């Protein structure tokens, strides 16, 4: 249509500029045709626009009707679902409200992450709605623990009387723990007939906390027990308690026996469920710690490497407390892996000066380390000892010369005969490995000592080449020293051969 309008404008301009009558008639005819064509085109476009508008209106109306139908269906489904959820919540609240005042076994998560079940009293139902692990609606119950073992479990006396001035967060004691209703278990009553020697129990102390202990003796006539408490002072370790101040604990072995004898008992079922939950939690925690150890930085120095000189009681205690080798310290295994090194800073220097010294040493973090200083001092001391020993061995006086030259031959021969006789008579197979190691070290020292004596005799021969008599004695002494050295070397060879036969062999397939 734009092209037609442009052609019409061009034709009109040509009419204004043309004077020829024939051309003007042709242009007038062309202008008339273009005007008719434009009029027809406008009418056609108007009709098409009206039809398209009608189609869009119809589609819009259809879409609105479908949306209304979907909204009505969703509203109906939501109303039905809301009614079902409201009915479910109503039934749950009615069920839990009926349990208010009843005793149960409720979970408690300690500050270090461990989960344990304790007997508790249900004192209320919380208004908040939660979703449990099975993606189901649930409510929380407010419980007070009957046998609190830690301060955060101890009920507040003022709260029970309705006079506590602090809220639940600021109060040192418990205003009731909130636990999911689906996690509570059956109440475990105390089994007093189980009170016997070495029976583990919880005993109520004057601080209202229940401490672990073991029964020493039980008097069922007077309903009293003498209990040895764990972790108490020596004077207060053994105490007498009434039966109502004790709660017998069930060990894993006894729990397994009772579950075999009466598997249908609700008491045993609840204890089995508690133990299975605890086993699952411990297994999950251990697997998480092992997985964490695989991604932990492996230092060059092993944690506890100093215990190679001891019996390793520290590592054994840490392993008993649950430490896994390769992980960091702490209950989550995210603590330090390498031990903290002691640092000794220069006396009378500021921290800035110490930092400058460390930067001058290329930022060495162990520049002030105590271990490095001790190792450096040990190396200096070893070098000084070696130099002092070398000076002592090289220094000779008149008495040492006379002892070595005049009396050394007979004594050395006598010692050599004794060493050879001992090497022949000893049955090496009857000695232990430790004895063989000690004997190997002693023989090696004797060989080194004998080699030094031979070197001294050779020096004396070179120094006294003109004295014939002294030369004879020195040759005899040198021959004797060489025989003793050969005997010691043969004995060392037999020792090494015996030690080699006792080593574990590795077979290659």
Curated annotation (Swiss-Prot):
User: Cellular location of this protein?
Assistant: Nucleus
Ranges annotated as C3H1-type zinc finger: 155-178
Q: Where is the composition biased (Basic and acidic residues)?
A: 411-420
Which GO MF terms are attached to this record?
DNA-binding transcription repressor activity, RNA polymerase II-specific; RNA polymerase II cis-regulatory region sequence-specific DNA binding; zinc ion binding
Q: Spell out the Pfam families in the cross-references.
A: G-patch
Region labeled Disordered — which residues?
A: 253-277, 409-430
What is the documented function of this protein?
Transcription repressor.
Name of the protein in its database record:
Zinc finger CCCH-type with G patch domain-containing protein
């Amino acid at each position: 249509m734009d092209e037609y309008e442009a052609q019409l404008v061009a034709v009109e301009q040509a009419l204004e500029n043309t004077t020829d009558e024939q051309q003007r008639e042709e242009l007038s005819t062309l202008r008339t045709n273009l005007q008719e064509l434009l009029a027809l085109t406008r009418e056609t476009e108007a009709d098409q626009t009206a039809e398209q508008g009608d189609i869009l209106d119809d589609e819009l109306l259809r879409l609105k009707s479908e949306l209304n139908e979907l909204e009505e269906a969703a509203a109906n489904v939501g109303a039905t679902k809301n009614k079902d959820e409201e009915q479910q919540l109503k039934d749950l609240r009615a069920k839990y409200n009926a349990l208010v005042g009843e005793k149960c076994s409720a979970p408690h998560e300690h500050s270090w992450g461990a989960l344990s079940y304790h007997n508790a009293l249900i004192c209320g139902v919380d208004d908040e709605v939660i979703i449990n692990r099975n993606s189901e609606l649930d409510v929380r119950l407010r419980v007070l623990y009957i046998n609190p073992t830690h301060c955060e479990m101890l009920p507040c006396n003022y709260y029970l009387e309705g006079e506590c001035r602090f809220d639940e967060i600021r109060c040192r004691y418990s205003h009731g723990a909130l636990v999911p209703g689906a996690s509570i278990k059956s109440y475990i009553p105390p089994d007093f007939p189980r009170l016997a020697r070495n029976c583990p129990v919880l005993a109520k102390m004057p601080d209202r906390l229940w401490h672990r202990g073991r029964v020493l003796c039980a008097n069922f006539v007077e309903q009293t027990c003498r209990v040895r408490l764990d972790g108490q002072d020596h004077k207060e370790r053994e105490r007498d308690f009434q039966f109502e101040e004790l709660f017998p604990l069930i060990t894993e072995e006894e729990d397994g026996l009772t579950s075999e004898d009466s598997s249908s008992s609700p008491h045993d079922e609840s204890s089995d469920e508690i133990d299975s939950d605890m086993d699952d939690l411990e297994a999950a925690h251990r697997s998480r710690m092992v997985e964490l150890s695989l991604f932990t930085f492996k230092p060059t120095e092993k944690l506890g490497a100093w215990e190679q000189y001891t019996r390793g009681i520290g590592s054994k205690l840490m392993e008993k407390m649950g430490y896994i080798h390769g992980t960091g310290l702490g209950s989550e295994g995210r603590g330090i892996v390498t031990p903290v090194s002691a640092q000794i800073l220069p006396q009378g220097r500021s921290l800035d000066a110490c930092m400058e010294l460390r930067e001058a040493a290329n930022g060495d973090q162990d520049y002030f380390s105590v271990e490095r200083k001790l190792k450096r001092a040990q190396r200096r001391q070893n070098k000084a000892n070696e130099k002092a020993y070398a000076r002592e061995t090289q220094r000779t006086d008149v008495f040492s010369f006379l002892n070595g030259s005049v009396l050394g031959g007979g004594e050395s021969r006598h010692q050599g005969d004794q060493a050879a006789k001992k090497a022949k008579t000893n049955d090496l197979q009857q000695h232990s490995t430790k004895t063989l190691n000690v004997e190997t070290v002693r023989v090696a020292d004797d060989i080194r000592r004998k080699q030094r004596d031979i070197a001294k005799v050779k020096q004396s021969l070179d120094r006294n080449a003109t004295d014939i008599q002294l030369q004879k004695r020195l040759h005899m002494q040198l021959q004797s020293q060489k025989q003793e050295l050969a005997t010691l070397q043969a004995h060392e060879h037999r020792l090494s051969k015996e030690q080699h036969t006792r080593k574990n062999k590795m077979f290659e397939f």
